[in-house]
Amino acid sequence: MKNQKIRIRLKAFDYKLIDQSAAEIVDTAKRTGAVVRGPVPLPTRIRRYDVLRSPHVNKTSRDQFEIHTHQRLMDIVDPTDKTVDALMRLDLPAGVDVEIALQ
């Protein structure tokens, strides 16, 4: 796997889970001899929703909700076969979305 790069993008609503998962991935990759760049914190995406409180009148009375999506980006440079096997066997929490791309 010479001259290849693995790009890992993590997304989660809880920043503690995403930092914990990123640290676990970095430790696993470094144990197998790969070079890791990151984790790089990407901008937090905030989605805001306004919902009417009343089903009939009182248009000015609303509830406001927010969802924060935290993101991290990591690059694993020159991964070995052991690195790929270790990352495949890695068990991450259910609240973390992982996107892996080979470049």
Curated annotation (Swiss-Prot):
GO cellular component: ribonucleoprotein complex; ribosome
Alphabetized UniProt keyword annotations: Ribonucleoprotein, Ribosomal protein
MF-aspect GO terms: structural constituent of ribosome; tRNA binding
Pfam families tied to this protein: Ribosomal_S10
InterPro entries for this protein: Ribosomal_uS10, Ribosomal_uS10_CS, Ribosomal_uS10_dom, Ribosomal_uS10_dom_sf
Family assignment from sequence similarity: Belongs to the universal ribosomal protein uS10 family.
Described function: Involved in the binding of tRNA to the ribosomes.
Entries under HAMAP family matching the protein: Ribosomal_uS10
NCBIfam families documented for this protein: PRK00596.1, rpsJ_bact
Protein name stated in the entry: Small ribosomal subunit protein uS10
Lineage: Bacteria, Pseudomonadati, Pseudomonadota, Betaproteobacteria, Burkholderiales
Gene name for this UniProt entry: rpsJ
